[in-house]
Amino acid sequence: MTDRYTIHSQLEHLQSKYIGTGHADTTKWEWLVNQHRDSYCSYMGHFDLLNYFAIAENESKARVRFNLMEKMLQPSGPPADKPEEN
């Protein structure tokens, strides 16, 4: 019984500490945005992968990095409208 409580409290701690871990009310759109932003950050952080993208797109590394940062603003487009509950 104590293991279940410990795991639950650890999960709550992680969810409050880190943005991308989600919570019970996380929507599909929020989860997708977190995944895309995580991927773009990883691409920018790995020098060889950034070089690969720059060569494949025939752009400079700075331009590729700028484009990735621009994509991070709204990687999945605007959020879907929620239906109104009456």
UniProtKB/Swiss-Prot annotation:
Annotated GO biological process: mRNA splicing, via spliceosome; positive regulation of DNA-templated transcription; regulation of DNA repair; regulation of RNA splicing
Entry GO terms, CC: nucleoplasm; nucleus; SAGA complex; U12-type spliceosomal complex; U2-type precatalytic spliceosome; U2-type spliceosomal complex
A GO molecular function held by the record: splicing factor binding
Site annotation Interaction with RNA: residues: Y5, G20
Keyword Phosphoprotein included in the entry's annotation: yes
Protein localization: Nucleus
N6-acetyllysine found at: K17
Function according to Swiss-Prot or TrEMBL: Component of the 17S U2 SnRNP complex of the spliceosome, a large ribonucleoprotein complex that removes introns from transcribed pre-mRNAs. The 17S U2 SnRNP complex (1) directly participates in early spliceosome assembly and (2) mediates recognition of the intron branch site during pre-mRNA splicing by promoting the selection of the pre-mRNA branch-site adenosine, the nucleophile for the first step of splicing.
A Pfam family assignment: SF3b10
Positions bearing Phosphoserine: S9
Any coiled-coil regions, as ranges: none
Keyword Repeat: no
Similarity comment: family membership: Belongs to the SF3B5 family.
Key words, A-Z: Acetylation, mRNA processing, mRNA splicing, Nucleus, Phosphoprotein, RNA-binding, Spliceosome
Quaternary structure and interacting proteins, as annotated: Component of the 17S U2 SnRNP complex, a ribonucleoprotein complex that contains small nuclear RNA (snRNA) U2 and a number of specific proteins. Part of the SF3B subcomplex of the 17S U2 SnRNP complex. SF3B associates with the splicing subcomplex SF3A and a 12S RNA unit to form the U2 small nuclear ribonucleoproteins complex (U2 snRNP). Within the SF3B subcomplex, interacts directly with SF3B1 (via HEAT domain) and SF3B3. Component of the minor spliceosome, which splices U12-type introns.
Signal peptide residues on this chain, from the entry's feature table: none
Protein name, as recorded: Splicing factor 3B subunit 5
Start and end residues of each stretch annotated as Interaction with SF3B1 and SF3B3: 15-76
UniProt modified residues of type N-acetylthreonine: T2
